Regions:
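Conserved class I S-adenosyl-L-methionine
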Residues: 113-124
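Non-catalytic substrate-recognition/targeting regions of SAM-dependent transferases
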Residues: 6-23, 29-96, 103
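Conserved beta-strand signature within the Rossmann-like core of class I S-adenosyl-L-methionine
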Residues: 226-230
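Conserved alpha-helix/loop element of class I SAM-dependent methyltransferases that forms part
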Residues: 96-114
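Mobile active-site "lid"/loop adjacent to the S-adenosyl-L-methionine
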Residues: 146-148, 170-174, 187-218
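Conserved SAM-binding motif I beta-strand of class I
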Residues: 138-143
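S-adenosyl-L-methionine
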Residues: 145-191
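Conserved SAM-binding loop of SAM-dependent methyltransferases across substrates and taxa
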Residues: 125-137
């Protein structure tokens, strides 16, 4: 198992009872989320200036309980800067555990000895996009959400990467890949983090069970390497 332990602004404190307790440095605040494994323990009280907890709900969403939490803040990973804010469904706009993947493919890109073209599908707020661009890759960033692509651009600007060769696209990932095949375009690597459920830019419903198999069959036709970031 790879452990994302190089963060200065983030730490996993506990994993128990189907929840996860995390420390995010703003001042300091803590978050407890569902969907992790471990032995149940008693709830911990946060000793920092701002406390945030996501509580288990009947549905997967959960909710935030917080005091003095800003609407937006920044955290840093090496030379990358990310703008975060709490969502109602217990996300912050970043999955810090993915940093181990960023390090892995960043080393591959830097050591390739030639220009590398990367396609990042379901690219969200751009963590993998920025890591690949910072390592020297030409990146095509595709996400169905206009808001998420705009957020990713903000992260790029905050990281000093606005002038890097990043192509920002709001598009249906499956349809985009199908068009790229017809165009004869190729990439050296593909990164994807598909959601289990979502909607396309025109309201199309995405459920991972069906289109994902088709998407894999498409990318295997012309991509040299596939890396899953989930």
């Amino acid at each position: 198992m790879w452990i994302a332990d190089k963060w200065k602004d983030y730490e996993v404190i506990d994993c128990s009872g189907g929840e996860k307790l995390e420390r995010w440095v703003i001042t300091h605040w803590y978050a407890r989320t569902r969907r992790s494994s471990g032995i149940p323990r008693k709830k911990k009280k946060a000793g920092s200036i701002g406390t945030v907890t996501t509580t288990a709900a009947k549905k997967a969403g959960g909710e935030w309980e917080f005091f003095d939490l800003p609407e937006q803040w920044q955290i840093h990973y090496g030379e990358l800067t990310f703008n975060l804010k709490p969502f109602s469904f217990k996300h912050t706009g970043l999955f810090p555990e993915q940093a181990t993947n960023w390090d892995w493919f960043g080393d591959k890109i830097r050591n390739a000895g030639r220009p590398i073209k990367v396609l990042n599908l379901f690219a969200y707020t751009g963590g993998a996009t920025l890591a690949a661009a910072a390592a020297g890759a030409h990146v095509t960033h595709v996400d169905a959400s206009k808001g998420m692509v705009a957020w990713a651009k903000e992260n790029a600007a905050s990281s000093g990467l606005s002038d890097k060769p990043i192509r920002w696209l709001v598009d249906d990932c499956v349809k985009f890949v199908e068009r790229e095949i017809r165009r004869g375009n190729h990439y050296d690597a593909i990164i994807m983090d598909p959601p289990s459920y979502g909607r396309g830019p025109k309201g199309e419903i995405w459920k991972i069970e069906m289109p994902f198999i088709h998407l894999l069959s498409c990318v295997l036709r012309f991509f040299l390497r596939i890396h899953f970031s989930s």
